[in-house]
Amino acid sequence: MSRVAKAPVAVPAGVQVTLNGQLLTVKGKNGELSREIHNAVEVKYEADTLTFAPKAGIVNADAQAGTARALVNAMVIGVTEGFTKKLQLVGVGYRAQMKGNTVALNLGFSHSVEHELPAGVTGECPSQTEIILKSADKQLIGQVAADIRAYRKPEPYKGKGVRYADEVVRIKEAKKK
């Protein structure tokens, strides 16, 4: 059995868990998330804990049990605390601002880049060079942050571009004569 799957997921007070066949729904103060659990995984919900066990005789059942446990743990954390991603814009003239549910980015192109945030993700710009994204869905917020970063990835010579707040960009040395 996977080491990750051996640890049960504790369900805090104020969080409702509904298990309908292989469909697991978690509801909390930050919203509601649901996920289909793989058929090779047996899920049990009792005494405010969720346990995951691989079904016998199925290939990769151990791995699926560990994956399911990690995903459900992220769902529980998401509906209680939520997830935050911070992006920084580095470069002369690089700016961001919120227009309703859309992030307007000036990234040195001849046009402004408008990125609409999907339902379940909220954004704010405390300064012109900073974007803060918040969501209950860890996968969704990571994808949105990656999409925004992909407009102008940090380049290796000056480090200009959109980067995660905790990202370290390795700077290359310029060519010598």
Swiss-Prot record:
Gene Ontology biological process terms from the UniProt entry: cytoplasmic translation
Keywords of this entry: Ribonucleoprotein, Ribosomal protein, RNA-binding, rRNA-binding
Keyword Thylakoid carried by entry: no
GO molecular function list: rRNA binding; structural constituent of ribosome
Domain of life: Bacteria
Gene Ontology CC annotations of this record: cytosolic large ribosomal subunit
Similarity remark: Belongs to the universal ribosomal protein uL6 family.
Quaternary structure (record): Part of the 50S ribosomal subunit.
Functional description taken from the UniProt entry: This protein binds to the 23S rRNA, and is important in its secondary structure. It is located near the subunit interface in the base of the L7/L12 stalk, and near the tRNA binding site of the peptidyltransferase center.
UniProt-listed NCBIfam families: L6_bact
Record's protein name: Large ribosomal subunit protein uL6
Organism of origin: Glaesserella parasuis serovar 5 (strain SH0165) (Haemophilus parasuis)
Lineage: Bacteria, Pseudomonadati, Pseudomonadota, Gammaproteobacteria, Pasteurellales
